[in-house]
Amino acid sequence: LVRTYSERMYWHARQMVFDHDDANDIIQNSFIKVWEALPNFRGDSKLYTWLYRIVANESLTFLKKRHTRSLLSFESYSQTLENKLIADPLFNGNKIQLALQKAIATLPPKQRNVFILKYFQDLKYEEISEITGISVGSLKASYHHAFEKVKNFILQIDRYSD
């Protein structure tokens, strides 16, 4: 189970929190929860959607705790995430990728989760609904708002870089 899914789960957590060590902690906690809950897995959803839900929830919980502990405004916290991304030795992206990741860092955590699952993981809204427990209609609206925010952020950066 760990060998099969750990890399995909790691990258989902990593896109949520941007920090390698934080993502590893989330994955470790997630797989502990999976191990404890596996006997109760009924198979109502696909295994990977169940795993994604656990990782997404762990990521959101982590972000809430980090935000609450730091007592930073959302904007300050987003800036902290951007700074972590820029300083990350594993990030070797170009300016466009950096702008995209910075834009994603400005999204509220739940919107970020929806955006990542749809844009990067290319999941269908029905699958995202299984993972998040959010209706398909709400997901479409959330993704649309996230997409517009990301697009406007990148256009704003492009305007100021000319």
Annotate each language-model stretch with its function:
Residues 10-29, 136, 157-162:
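Short, charged helix-capping/linker segments at alpha-helix termini
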